């Protein structure tokens, strides 16, 4: 049976694979488990994924990248963009039919350990990643609009902080709205994949871009979206 956005939002149990357990992956995993979602963790260093799963309890487990993708309905790659591109190339067939969540930003550490942009101005990592995925994957750009510290600390505040997302896929939209809500944030769609550049670093809707370090709520996000339309 073909999955629909309605069935995925209503399903009682959904499994999210989180590939990478650095600051972003760890924060998302913790928030999702606290929100009642099941996660399966994988990382280059499997012992770190196993240790985090043990901390998070019965809704979390750890395994290999290949098994995590296979078991999951949703796959979130919490890794640097270059690593993400390699992982897609290695696991293309397994990603068919999966909702793929990309929180990456077009940045990396240079030879001096400084953070530098890795793509030309105006090009988003979201558009790059979407172009590498198989046609059967359901792509969404999300969980990368806040810095790692804010992502970890701003969940479930009052009023709720917003996480923007971008997708052209209804199934991916339903899944990410469920996950963002479970993680303790309000989901707000910025647009299709062509809007990904707005929610990445230096973009108009990114904390370290047009928001000038601010974390916004739904009312503020609505005003920002209206100003941009």
Q: Where do the protein language model's features map onto the residues?
A:
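NAD(P)+-binding Rossmann beta1-loop-alpha1 motif at the extreme N-terminus of oxidoreductases
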Residues: 2-58
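Conserved SAM-binding loop
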Residues: 41, 76, 165
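Active-site phosphate/pyrophosphate- and oxyanion-stabilizing loops and adjacent acidic/basic residues
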Residues: 50, 89, 127, 131
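Rossmann-like NAD(P)-binding element
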Residues: 57-60, 65-113
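Rossmann-fold NAD(P)-binding glycine/threonine-rich loop
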Residues: 104-140, 145-149, 154
């Amino acid at each position: 049976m073909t999955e629909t956005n309605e069935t995925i939002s209503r399903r009682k149990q959904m499994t999210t694979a989180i590939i990478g357990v650095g600051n972003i992956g760890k924060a998302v995993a913790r928030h999702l488990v606290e929100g009642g979602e099941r996660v399966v963790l994988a990382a280059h260093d499997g012992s770190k994924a196993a240790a985090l799963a043990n901390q998070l309890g019965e809704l979390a487990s750890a395994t290999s990248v290949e098994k995590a993708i296979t078991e999951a309905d949703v796959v979130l790659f919490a890794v640097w963009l270059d690593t993400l591109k390699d992982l897609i190339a290695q696991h293309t067939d397994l990603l068919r039919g999966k909702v793929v969540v990309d929180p990456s930003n077009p940045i990396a550490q240079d030879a001096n350990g400084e953070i530098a942009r890795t793509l030309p101005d105006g090009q988003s990592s979201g558009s790059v990643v979407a172009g590498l995925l198989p046609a059967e994957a359901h792509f969404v750009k999300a969980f990368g609009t806040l810095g790692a510290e804010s992502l970890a600390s701003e969940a479930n505040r009052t009023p709720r902080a917003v996480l923007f997302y971008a997708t052209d896929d209804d199934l991916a939209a339903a899944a990410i709205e469920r996950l963002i809500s479970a993680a303790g944030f309000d989901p707000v769609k910025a647009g299709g994949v062509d809007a990904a550049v707005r929610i990445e670093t230096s973009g108009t809707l990114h904390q370290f871009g047009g928001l000038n370090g601010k974390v916004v709520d739904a009312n503020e996000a609505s005003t920002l979206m209206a100003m941009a339309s």
